[in-house]
Structure formats: C-alpha cells, structure tokens
Amino acid sequence: MLRKAGLACTICGSRNYTLNLSSVAKEKRVEVKKFCRTCGKHTLHKETR
C-alpha cells in the first residue's frame, strides 16, 4: 500500500512536492534536491509526515 508524503524546502520551509511512498517503515526520511519556487533555486527538500 502507498502513503502520501510531502517534501518541504529546508531553507524556506514551503511544501512544494508530494510523493507516493511504500508504507514499509523506513528509518530515514527521504531527502531530494529539487527546485524551490519560493527560493528560486535548487535546494534540499526533506520528507514531511
């Protein structure tokens, strides 16, 4: 089963993206470098629950 998780910018905190992840419990949260529209540059985005 899939669960929905959001990705938030580590600099400004805005939630820009959503992901469908497997429901298997993971120890670490997903970290991806994506473009932030608020900051106007590529920044690290971390999974929010």
Swiss-Prot record:
The protein's matches in Gene3D superfamilies, at most eight in alphabetical order, are given as: Ribosomal protein L33
- Name the GO terms of the biological process aspect: translation
- What is a GO molecular function of this protein? structural constituent of ribosome
Q: Enumerate the UniProt keywords alphabetically.
A: Ribonucleoprotein, Ribosomal protein
Q: Which InterPro entries match?
A: Ribosomal_bL33, Ribosomal_bL33_sf, Ribosomal_zn-bd
HAMAP family registered for this protein in UniProt: Ribosomal_bL33
Q: What is this protein called?
A: Large ribosomal subunit protein bL33B
Species per Swiss-Prot/TrEMBL record:
Lactococcus lactis subsp. lactis (strain IL1403)
Supply the gene name.
rpmG2
